[in-house]
């Protein structure tokens, strides 16, 4: 079976009057809520049909990028909807394209996982 390597990204939401991040484990589809803490950011993409089951709606897909030379600042790239990505392959392609277009930037505290190519968002 072939596998593809994807990056983890944040989904931003407001919970309990403070910024929080909804972490979605793509492998087991378990939702974990975590408050923003320093530079510790970790998340993966969620499937569209799971959006309605989250405690709060998450309207924007936010890629958190950190300039390599200035750790104190970050750049947010918003996509109107997760359904913008028709498949896991297009999602990976978009991330790869972004890394080429913005070489000085890197994903903040990026983590990686392997998923079957047959998976879809």
From Swiss-Prot:
Recorded GO cellular component terms are: membrane
Domain of life, per UniProt, equals: Eukaryota
Miscellaneous comment: Partially overlaps VPS64.
Which residues are listed as membrane-spanning? 26-46, 57-77, 90-110
How is this protein situated with respect to the membrane? Multi-pass membrane protein
To which species is this protein native? Saccharomyces cerevisiae (strain ATCC 204508 / S288c) (Baker's yeast)
Q: Which UniProt keywords apply?
A: Membrane, Transmembrane, Transmembrane helix
Spell out the subcellular localization from the entry.
Membrane
Protein name stated in the entry: Putative uncharacterized membrane protein YDR199W
